[in-house]
């Protein structure tokens, strides 16, 4: 049965681009968003006809753009990365910052939790990758064989049998690092422009990367090789694998594309109807993506400050 995605509702509350989104398996009615307005919002999802949810709590503390956010696997904590050069660990039940992570010398662009939530990795415009413990101590800074330009994205593999970190940069490289030694395992070469995003499949076997060249490259993390590429035909801002279907979603500067990885074809292309867009002004672009844990809802953050929720439906 073929499937498609339908716009189910919106979440409005940010006063800047929605740069990042995170969901929780433990708290299916919660969504976390980070924004250029320097704040994060914990949303309570109601899935009503009129509003898909409401802001339950706003997290203040960063003094510049929030670039990335992630929720711990137990749903109790969140991490945020900011252009104020710091990371923050938040207790979601109270909305308080429990730790500040200070050490990067330029904007922090990306943050990720290890599968056991005991380690944290961050990537920055200072061209370094830092590993931290949850107490806020920097345990290691990766510079040897590191990126020669901004580090745009860092992600831990969820697979405990192959504990690696994947990073991407404006030097057009995807790098895979062995977690135990923090040594470079593989340089994945092939992109012709800067890379904005990497994402790892739920089982840790696949990695996808995308950016300026409009091509999504898929890499086998177990065999350390390039598998194939999918053309999105436009700059890619964000990528995310579905948690329960063999799909990859790419947010580009013109639409959101859902790829079926088995058929290597497009399942759907999502483009909302934007109101009040003049001929000269640019249409809002999707710059962040997150799936609900059950894989039924795709959350998309846009440059018009709105989060849109798309639901998977069977085609009639």
Swiss-Prot record:
Compartment(s) where it occurs, according to its Swiss-Prot or TrEMBL record: Cytoplasm
A single MF term (Gene Ontology): protein kinase C binding
Top-rank taxon, per record: Eukaryota
SMART domains: WD40
Key words, A-Z: Cytoplasm, Repeat, Ribonucleoprotein, Ribosomal protein, WD repeat
Ranges for the WD repeats: 13-44, 61-91, 103-133, 146-178, 190-220, 231-260, 281-311
One protein family per Pfam: WD40
GO CC aspect terms: cytosol; cytosolic small ribosomal subunit; nucleus
InterPro entries assigned: G-protein_beta_WD-40_rep (IPR020472), RACK1-like (IPR045223), WD40/YVTN_repeat-like_dom_sf (IPR015943), WD40_repeat_CS (IPR019775), WD40_repeat_dom_sf (IPR036322), WD40_rpt (IPR001680)
Cited CDD domains: WD40
Chief location: cytoplasm
Family: Belongs to the WD repeat G protein beta family. Ribosomal protein RACK1 subfamily.
Purpose: Component of the ribosome, a large ribonucleoprotein complex responsible for the synthesis of proteins in the cell. The small ribosomal subunit (SSU) binds messenger RNAs (mRNAs) and translates the encoded message by selecting cognate aminoacyl-transfer RNA (tRNA) molecules. The large subunit (LSU) contains the ribosomal catalytic site termed the peptidyl transferase center (PTC), which catalyzes the formation of peptide bonds, thereby polymerizing the amino acids delivered by tRNAs into a polypeptide chain.
The protein's name: Small ribosomal subunit protein RACK1
Source species of the chain: Neurospora crassa (strain ATCC 24698 / 74-OR23-1A / CBS 708.71 / DSM 1257 / FGSC 987)
Lineage: Eukaryota, Fungi, Dikarya, Ascomycota, Pezizomycotina
